Amino acid sequence: MTGDDLEGLTFAAEPDEALSGWTVVVSAGREGDAYAGALDVTASATPSETAVTLTVTDRNGKPWSATTPTLTAVQAPVTAIDLSRDGTANCYIVSEAGDYMFDAAVRGNGSGDDAAIALADGMKADWLWVTKGLEQEISAVSLDAGKGRIFFTAAGAAKGNAVIALADAAGEIVWSWHLWFTPEPRRVTYANGRVLLDRSLGAVGTTPGSAEAYGLYYQWGRKDPFCGGTAPETSATAFAQAAKNSVVNPAFADTHAWKQESGAAVSTLEYAAAHPLSFLSNKGATGVYDWLAKPRADLWNTAKTCYDPCPVGYKVPDRDTWDDFADDQDRYVDGTSEWDGEKYGMTYIFGDLRDWYPTSGYRNRDKGNLAGLATTRTGHYWSNYRSGNTISCFYISKKLSTGKLLQPQSSSKSDAAYGYNVRCCRE
């Protein structure tokens, strides 16, 4: 290209479609009256082919060339870490900054006849809620339906939790995934051969006495995590701490909030998937509380299901996982237990291993309020076992007024509507 006025040139790239993050890089040099150079145009949006019109103007604002070449710019693909490369799940661990993606066309681990998600025009993805303070931790959430992937960027500066939701064209949530922003959990091998993560699902630390070790709460058979707190709640104040400790995306805030709902109309799998922030409760004829009007015993199982909340390679534990936590309050078959009255919890000891189980309470089966955090400290950890209305969990309790440690129970019975912690076990 040559011209009479070659200094102070301005290059503008205008894509035919609206793409954010375009940059123009110019490298050039003068040779006599000629001005030679190269123009690189790079877009940072989802990879696509886009027609680009290049306009060159001189320092007086006049077109430098009467012709405007039309180029086809092929955006270089963003290198994103595929969290689902080793398998899919309802939870993915994020331990460092970077660009990420995961399979959006599969529910959970893909098991079962209803695990596939049909991605359609008009669908979109965005974060639903995040731990308060993590609003800037997750960004650039988008769905690439053609690739069947959801993309996002993690800043890597904070610890906590987030949920990404996939919504249809009408804004209804189709499915959602939990992002667990935590240092990579340590794997703890018990004497019975079971390998468990060293923290509750959703916990961002393991220090005894720290609320970072509390983790999230789950109703039996649901994949959806519920935020907790450090103090008991009444029925009237249920989810006050969840609302305080998290932020709901304004894009969803008109239709989604932490709350309790009951009744047959909302007690279905479909409603639960579409309302991840709703704590569901349905009282059966026998007085047993379930979040389903028609209870199912196969939502969690010995073989991991598409409703299991654990990360890739892990599942909700079998009920015999804690059998070695025997009747003896002080010493177990494969190790010892130490109750910490100031930090409220038990440390499982086996050789050089230490595994902290906090008494982080639970969410009540009817109104969803936090309990077990006052005069009696309790810890509840779900197993995957259910037979009829009998559901097993690992249970710890300490009556603070007397200092009496109530016997740890490796297979305590409970209702599915309760919100308990989960300690994930390797498949």
Residue ranges with predicted function:
Residues 67-73:
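Terminal edge beta-strands and adjacent linker/stalk segments
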Residues 76-304, 387, 416-427:
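Short, compositionally biased
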Residues 59-67, 170-175:
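Short, exposed coil/turn segments at beta-strand boundaries within extracellular/luminal domains
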Residues 30, 34-47, 145-159:
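Extracellular/luminal low-complexity segments enriched in Ser/Thr/Pro
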Residues 2-9, 19:
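Extracellular acidic loop/turn motifs
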Residues 39, 47-59, 158-169:
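A short beta-strand micro-motif common to beta-rich folds, especially ectodomain repeats
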Residues 163, 203, 277, 282-427:
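C-terminal, surface-exposed recognition/capping segments
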